């Protein structure tokens, strides 16, 4: 429909309808498995905080890419309920992804994966930067990708798009 809004602000009632309260039949798989591709040796706090925040939402399981020994040790020391994996994200069984926070050039492959993942994904920081280039190359993020940039990341994102196609703006 041409008049269907592309953006909508949710109110309290919308959230009540969308969020399921766990009951006695709930378990980790019914509550959702979230894959996390966050953090780096330079920014380990991004991994620790994002995983802790995810765990605090009530998600059933968090699977964290812990291919770096140091980051994996930190993660399990702070968040022992986290399940770490070391292989490619494509081999993991998750319901959704979150990533990009605290990532750097060494995790470029993870951010690329988020852009193409068949599962829904929340893209932050480094993944937002990569998303602009991805879009300008003619690719689509699809309807299940959410960008969560802070003001500086949003400015870089929009600047890249504007520089590539100024006539669109």
PLM features: residue spans?
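Small-residue (G/A/S/T)-rich helix-start motifs and N-terminal tracts that mark the onset
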Residues: 1-122, 129-146, 151-169
């Amino acid at each position: 429909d041409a008049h269907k809004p592309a953006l909508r602000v949710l109110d309290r009632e919308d959230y009540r309808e969308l969020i399921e309260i766990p009951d006695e039949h709930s378990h980790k798989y019914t509550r959702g498995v979230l894959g996390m591709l966050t953090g780096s040796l330079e920014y380990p706090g991004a991994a620790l905080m994002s995983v802790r925040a995810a765990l605090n939402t009530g998600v059933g399981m968090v699977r964290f890419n812990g291919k770096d020994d140091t980051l994996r040790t930190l993660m399990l020391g702070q968040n022992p309920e986290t399940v770490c994996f070391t292989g490619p994200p494509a081999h993991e069984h998750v319901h959704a992804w979150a990533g990009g926070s605290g990532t750097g050039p060494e995790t470029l492959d993870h951010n690329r994966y988020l852009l193409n993942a068949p599962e829904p994904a929340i893209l932050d920081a480094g993944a937002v930067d990569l998303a602009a280039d991805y879009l300008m190359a003619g690719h689509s993020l699809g309807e299940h990708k959410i960008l969560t940039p802070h003001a500086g990341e949003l400015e870089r994102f929009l600047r890249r798009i504007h520089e590539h196609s100024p006539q669109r703006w």
